[in-house]
């Protein structure tokens, strides 16, 4: 049985990323460069059109994808220990921005809009926040979070990334995304395989209850979202050509 174009593209990404993670434990600048060389505006249009024409691939991707509590649609294209993920923040979309870290490093490429990130650090003289410890779901239990008391943190620096920029986020680095919601923003990111342990989660405002059981997307919702993003990329392509 012949593979569809979407299956060919995803298989090609998987083969190359399998080779990368056979050698490298963490994300690095080489992985960021790989993202930049495979997910240009034109290449993204080709990929999205292929996925939208392939019901089987769309269904498989849908089973791994959901609306994240931090305000973006998380589209998991590959999950092979490492994950290749498309993140989309739609204009006007409300979001819950928490300080957090990860049990894995990742590389990220900005596909649309601009992304402002705050990098935070532990500091005895810093602002005091309520901290939670997030435990990921396992085969035996659902995800849960536990209160860990108050922790003083200090803003270390702010970075602004725009279309075409890419960067690496080390595991364990406290950060949060700032997205005012006035524009569509999208990134393609690849996360290294998850390590054992827990994640730090620090809500920025009192009373926020971080969403650890986000709603799954259904196939029609995902198709509609990808089509909307595709139309945005085509308009972006037209602007570049003009």
Kindly give the residue locations of the regions a language model identified:
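Short, conserved beta-strand element in jelly-roll/cupin
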Residues: 103-117, 121, 190
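A short hydrophobic beta-strand segment most commonly corresponding to one strand
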Residues: 107, 183-199
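Short acidic-glycine-tyrosine-enriched beta hairpin
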Residues: 121-171
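Extended, charged low-complexity segments
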Residues: 203-242
